[in-house]
């Protein structure tokens, strides 16, 4: 029995360590900061769809629904966190989708209006560029909320605590 528990703990620790190699480590976001970002930085409009890049335990998705998002979509590579997210959001059936996969190779849903990301300083510019590609393809502006890091080389339009808002407009002259 003890060996089984130790084995499960070791597997869980390994999953968290391995997923941290491919992206940002899991750091829970404070609910109060998320609430503040969604009320002061970028309040939701009626048909807003939020995509969370590296959705972790689903707290951002949950708070986005509470704040008025019509739909939320999360991408997470840690299967344990995907399960926790699904459990957290189970009362919101039909308003959330969580994918167990990397977001780097996905095409954004056509109706995405807000992208939320906590990325390490080495990745946040690449995430911004990914959202710029999505904006170019859709021909629509997408608001990008970065938690914890500013995007180097770009000016944010607003800041609330550790959240930075960027309004990404399509660049029609670029090929995507």
Show which residues each predicted segment covers:
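Conserved SAM-binding motif I beta-strand of class I
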Residues: 71-76
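Conserved SAM-binding strand-loop segment of SAM-dependent methyltransferases
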Residues: 92-103
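Conserved class I S-adenosyl-L-methionine
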Residues: 46-56
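Conserved SAM-binding loop
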Residues: 85
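S-adenosyl-L-methionine
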Residues: 1-45
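Conserved beta-strand signature within the Rossmann-like core of class I S-adenosyl-L-methionine
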Residues: 139-150
